[in-house]
Amino acid sequence: MIIEIVTIFPLFFKSFCDNSIIKRALNQQKVQIKIHDLRKYSVNKHQQVDDCVYGGGVGMLLSFPPFFDCLQEIKTPQSKVILLSPQGKIFDQVQANNYASNTPHLIILCGNYEGVDARILKYVDQEISIGDYVLTGGEIAATVVVDAIVRLIPGVIKHESAFSDSHQQGLLKFPQYTRPQIYQNQEVPSVLLSGNHAQIENWRQKESLKITLQKRPDLLINKKLSSKEKVILEEIKQELKNNS
């Protein structure tokens, strides 16, 4: 997979690409990440890429020509172009899976200042937001999107690890514990020490449903539960009701 990021702050991504799973994926050639400095496509001798807003308004807007010229150079018939924008669809695990599985070439455009000239939208396949809040620029959001996608590329991390992550199955992950077994009078649940894999799996399934119900009940609205999960969920609701 090739990911190309268009930004006015190319150095922002250096440490991101030099650490952890991203670095491993790059070293293993599971992914290529190319950073493009938008200023290099400026038609201004001072490499200016922003200008005042037509009709008046506060702040500066990223210009259309640099983005257009950059896309003319790097876009291919296989490319998908996304613009990081507060107006975009909220990025989620479903989208991450879709891009990791079906997009050999992804181009990410980072907005800044007051946004981008609206004419670039003609060349964008999807606008994406990472949440209903304001960031200084699209670079932080780009690292979120790239990290979520890259870790799903086959071979980057163990399949079992990615498969069991929160949100991957539409639910939050069950609680996890490590040594010591007892600390500050807090004990690891005994079932996890039993060695009974069936009981452990049942416990994890129930805890996953319970945590999702308590912390992110909205996830259960569109989640297609199995018959077993439906029974467990009703048990959880009754237990919580009895303990309230």
UniProtKB/Swiss-Prot annotation:
The entry marks the following residues as binding S-adenosyl-L-methionine, namely: 111, 130-135
Q: What class of enzyme is it?
A: transferase
Name the Gene Ontology molecular function terms of this record: tRNA (guanine(37)-N1)-methyltransferase activity
Which Enzyme Commission number(s) are listed?
2.1.1.228
Keyword Methyltransferase in annotation: yes
Q: Which Pfam families match?
A: tRNA_m1G_MT
Quote the InterPro entries the UniProt record gives: Alpha/beta_knot_MTases, tRNA_m1G_MeTrfase_C_sf, tRNA_m1G_MeTrfase_TrmD, tRNA_m1G_MTases_N, tRNA_MeTrfase_TRMD/TRM10
Subcellular location, in the record's words? Answer: Cytoplasm
| Keyword tags | Cytoplasm, Methyltransferase, S-adenosyl-L-methionine, Transferase, tRNA processing
Q: Which reaction does it catalyse?
A: guanosine(37) in tRNA + S-adenosyl-L-methionine = N(1)-methylguanosine(37) in tRNA + S-adenosyl-L-homocysteine + H(+)
Q: Which GO terms describe its biological process?
A: tRNA N1-guanine methylation
Q: Name one GO cellular component term.
A: cytosol
Purpose: Specifically methylates guanosine-37 in various tRNAs.
- Give the multimer and partner information: Homodimer.
Entry's family note: Belongs to the RNA methyltransferase TrmD family.
The protein's name: tRNA (guanine-N(1)-)-methyltransferase
The species this protein was found in: Phytoplasma australiense
Taxonomic lineage of this organism? Bacteria, Bacillati, Mycoplasmatota, Mollicutes, Acholeplasmatales
